Amino acid sequence: MITVALAKGALLKDSVARFAAAGLDFSAVLDKDNRQLMVPTPCGRARALLVRNGDVPTYVSYGQAQLGVVGFDVLKEHQLPVAQLVDLGFGGCRMAVAVQESSGYTRAADLPAHCRVASKFTQCAREYFDALDLPVELVHLNGSVELGPITGMSEAIVDLVATGRTLRENGLIAIEDLFHSTARLVGHPLSVRLDNGPLASIVDAIRAATPVGSFS
């Protein structure tokens, strides 16, 4: 039986729809009354593991799931050994540096050396500022990173931005993008290499169901 790690939250509905195109019905995970974390398909060919977004690469890299759907931002942050198979196009957002609108900063290089930068994505932030050759003190936060500049704890933040509404409502502005992120179909490398057909057929069907240029 093929095991697929699906992230709870914003990516779940589109993930289920994409697997449906491959003949796998995971719609039971969308039932608001569902409390099961391991949900088989009616056909018995596969089962879904409902996990946190950040845990998808872990389940896939350790082989507890042969396939998974996760945001590119998570892959960049955790850097676990998984095979990136298909850019699914949905869940589009960008990783950005943001500051208070009144700060006067217009690009990341304007930030003072050794200033504090708050983020949930400290690995991504570290790589970015290292590439700029700008030493900063990274402050790891698990939520509401916008409060960093508002309270004066940090000069800037690095966070995911979709519409930018949260930034605007808190007096912040994005000044530079690190990268664009979309949902990715990932696989356990050894399982993909040793596959004798079942995994490839699912991956091919999902790839065929992904419209070119429809990324959002």
Swiss-Prot record:
* A GO term for molecular function: ATP phosphoribosyltransferase activity
Enzyme Commission (EC) number: 2.4.2.17
Keywords (alphabetical) are: Amino-acid biosynthesis, ATP-binding, Cytoplasm, Glycosyltransferase, Histidine biosynthesis, Nucleotide-binding, Transferase
Question: What chemistry does it catalyse, as a reaction equation?
Answer: 1-(5-phospho-beta-D-ribosyl)-ATP + diphosphate = 5-phospho-alpha-D-ribose 1-diphosphate + ATP
Q: Where in the cell is it found?
A: Cytoplasm
Q: Which InterPro entries match?
A: ATP_PRibTrfase_cat, ATP_PRibTrfase_CS, ATP_PRibTrfase_HisG, ATP_PRibTrfase_HisG_short
Q: Name one Pfam family in it.
A: HisG
Q: Which GO terms describe its biological process?
A: L-histidine biosynthetic process
Q: Which GO terms describe its cellular component?
A: cytoplasm
Which residue windows are transmembrane per the record? none
Q: Which domain of life is it from?
A: Bacteria
| Pathway, per record | Amino-acid biosynthesis; L-histidine biosynthesis; L-histidine from 5-phospho-alpha-D-ribose 1-diphosphate: step 1/9
Q: PROSITE patterns this protein is in?
A: ATP_P_PHORIBOSYLTR
Family to which this protein belongs: Belongs to the ATP phosphoribosyltransferase family. Short subfamily.
Its annotated function is as follows: Catalyzes the condensation of ATP and 5-phosphoribose 1-diphosphate to form N'-(5'-phosphoribosyl)-ATP (PR-ATP). Has a crucial role in the pathway because the rate of histidine biosynthesis seems to be controlled primarily by regulation of HisG enzymatic activity.
Q: Subunit structure, per the record?
A: Heteromultimer composed of HisG and HisZ subunits.
What does the entry note on its domains? Lacks the C-terminal regulatory region which is replaced by HisZ.
Q: What is this protein called?
A: ATP phosphoribosyltransferase
| Native organism | Synechococcus sp. (strain CC9605)
